[in-house]
Amino acid sequence: AEVIGADYAYLLFEFPPQQLPQAVAGLKALGAAGFNVTMPYKQAIMEYLDEIDAEARLLNAVNTVRIDENGRLYGSNTDYFGFRQSLKDAGVPVEGRRVTVLGAGAVSGPVWLTLSEERAGHVTWLNRTLDRAEACAAQMNRRSAGIADAALLTRENLNRQIRESDLI
């Protein structure tokens, strides 16, 4: 906040998942301008929000909540905007490219959405557990049919993808 001249503090609050409603009420009562959430709260927070942006709704995950002057809560997913902008800032073209994604964890949603919107040619998800990689590929294929596949993250699969991919 100091860097941009804003009078805000960024504080860490830890609480058990069952106390999420009280945490949200407490932040509103304190007059907080907003807050961030991480796992395991990215889906759970959604039921307490007054409005959710289209990308967060599509991803079924919110990580940033803004509280307006009337106490209304607005949710968004800044992982999506951050990943998309980092590709643009780096001048990395995605359209038509063969892409390999290593991992299928918590930020895989913003990755698959960005790669779909930027019209990647083909995306291979490599992960230590095949079911998570397949779930990411399935999400992409529901949005852009036939664009994605999945494989276990093994040395052999990784070496093949390094040779065959334009972007990793």
Predicted regions and their residues:
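Phosphate/diphosphate ligand-binding glycine-rich loop within oxidoreductases
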Residues: 2-90
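Short, charged/polar "capping" segments at the starts of alpha-helices
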Residues: 44, 130-135
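Rossmann-like NAD(P)-binding element
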Residues: 152-168
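Short gly/ser/thr-rich secondary-structure transition/capping motifs
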Residues: 16, 85, 145-155
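Receiver (REC) domain switch-region micro-motif
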Residues: 35, 99, 168
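Short, conserved SAM-binding/catalytic segment
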Residues: 136-145
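Glycine-rich adenosine-cofactor-binding loop
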Residues: 77-80, 87, 92-120, 127-128, ...
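A general structural motif
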Residues: 32, 96-97, 120-122, 164-165
